[in-house]
Every structure is written in C-alpha cells, then in structure tokens.
Amino acid sequence: MSRPPRPTSSSRSNCSGGVFDWEPALRKLDELNARVEDPTLWNDPDEAQAVSRERSRLSAQVEAVHGLERDLADALGYAELADEEGDEASLDEARAQLREIKERAARAELEALLSGEADGNDAYVEINSGAGGTESNDWAGMLLRMYTRWAQAHGMSVDVIEETAGEQAGIKSVTLQVKGTNAYGWLKTEAGVHRLVRISPYDSSARRHTSFASVWVYPVIDDNIEIEINPADVRTDTYRASGAGGQHVNKTDSAVRLTHIPTGIAVACQTQRSQHQNRDQAWKMLRARLYELELEKREAAQQALEDQKTDIGWGHQIRSYVLQPYQMVKDLRTEVETSDTQGVLDGDLDAFMGAALAQRVGATRDAAA
C-alpha cells in the first residue's frame, strides 16, 4: 500500500488555505479570547454576546481541524503498521477510516464558508405549493419530507409551526422551524422554486405532469435583537386551526395570522391551542422575517448581487427533479446533478447545498475584489 505523507504544519496550511486560512484564524481566535477576558466588554451586553458567539463558532472550526489532524495521523500510523505486517484486513479498515476522514474534511471546509451574520441560527422554512392543485400539493408534501429527512440526518430537530393540508393529498403550505447548528446557513441555499416532472399517480391516463413549489428560508433570531415594528402597521387575523383532522384540531379561532402592511409580509401560527401562545409565536416569526429582509437589504447594497436575494418569484427556478421518462435531479445554478432521485428525495442534499454555498461565497468575494 502506497502511503501518503504525514501531515505537517506546511501541508496543513496548504489544505486549509482555501476557505479556512489557518494562521489568520488562530490570530483571530486569540484576539476574541482576549476580548472575552476583558471585563469592560460586558459593559455592552449585545456586543459581548456577539463576540462570544463568534469565538464559539471559530473555536469549533479550529477544534474540528485539530481533530481531523489527530485522526489522520492515527489512521496513517495504523495503515503503516498494517502494511509492514502484511495485514490486508487492517489495511482495508485503514482505507475506510481515511475515506471517512476525507468526508469529514470536505464537510469542515464547507462549514468554514458559513460566516454570515445569521448562518449559525436556527431556520424557518416555508414551503408553498404552486398552481396545479393536487399535483403541486403532493409535490410540496414531498419537499416537506425531504427537508425533514435532511435535518434529522444532520442531528437537527424539526417543528411544524403552521400547516395547511391539501384537499386530496400533500400540503398547500407549511412553515417549519429547523433547530440545529448552522441550520440557516445550510438551508438558505434552498430558497427558490423547485420543479417536479413525473407521471402523475393521480392521473388515470398516466400523463406526464410538471409541478412547482416554492421554498422560503429565513433565520430564527435572538429575542435580544431589536426589530422595531409599529403595531399600527400589523393586521391581526384569527381563524380555526386546520390540519389532518381528528380530536387534536382546535375548534376555536386559536390560529393567528399577522400581516405587516408596509411590506406585505404575512406569517401564521396554529401550533398551540391558545390564541395567546400562537400570537406570541407569530410575532417572533414576523420579527424574524423583517430581520431577514434587513439582512437582505444589507447584502444587496454591499454586493449588488440581485441573485443572492432570497425574495423569490415563480420564475426563480433553482432545481429540477425529473422522475419520468428518465431520472435526474439538476441544480440550475451550479449544474450539480445526480440520477439518484430517490436519494435526494430522502434528504441527500449535501452536494447541492455545498455547491450553492461555495458559489455564493465565490460571488461575494468577486464582488468585494
């Protein structure tokens, strides 16, 4: 077995110099540690929390690189010993370890791209079916399952905040709260229109149908972030919670919808039985939407890149899913594609997310150059 060289500080620098510059990262971490230890920092609680969050994020990235180095050195040492002893079984085990380390390194490299102001936050994900009735509703339901599977595979939790079921199948709309490290940073790459082409299971003539659904993603924001909202600018509507039915569906007008009149942004919550609780959650969601809008404006002003916006229209297709007459999922932004349609629909989205994230960061760097 031909063994690669052991890692050194030089090779480490070369490996991590693309999106995660090692020496600048260590200097930045030292600077953040010094700031956290400065008692005067805590005179401004908001600034102190921001510095602490940044230190935690960078510290986790540095530790991830250290962990990869340790595991790589161990795996190479194990492979060397197995090679000297002619132990093929142990060599196969070492190869498997190296493949796993390579996958972790690729993931760590992508994680280093998540440096946006809200990338580390939890995320709200809204899915809305397009025109087409049952077909589009079923497609929206398939997307709900896909994102739930993706989140669960990455150790994240998913709560349904609001859901409107389709008449025959699927959903008309749903709002999810995805909780986990960098949930927003990853999921923001999924904002856009998703197109499905298949032989309809609801068409007795077995004709091919095209369906659309939109995905909107925005960050869950901390309660201490100040978003000024004039109550006079918000219209409140109440209605009965809807869903799959059964004894748990509330028979009173406990669901709440808030509409921010100046922007037209509307949010709804029906998770709780209490109208008061639903109202509180809806206000949090509205603040988050307006916060995302503000982030969007900043990015647009700084980068002048309209295609970075998450404010989507039906013409903003990002991905096509073809199930018949052939099988292919293709991202229209990055050209990443795969014939493993079932794997994608089961939540295997990392290749698409990673490519879109790298493209975003590359566009941002080009704009800043």
Curated annotation (Swiss-Prot):
GO terms for cellular component: cytoplasm. Keywords: Cytoplasm, Methylation, Protein biosynthesis. It comes from Phenylobacterium zucineum (strain HLK1). Pfam families: PCRF (PF03462), RF-1 (PF00472). Methylated by PrmC. Methylation increases the termination efficiency of RF2. This is Peptide chain release factor 2. It is found in: Cytoplasm. InterPro entries: PCRF, Pep_chain_release_fac_I, Pep_chain_release_fac_I_sf, PrfB. The modification N5-methylglutamine is found at Q247. Its main location: cytoplasm. Peptide chain release factor 2 directs the termination of translation in response to the peptide chain termination codons UGA and UAA. PROSITE patterns: RF_PROK_I (PS00745). GO terms for molecular function: translation release factor activity, codon specific.
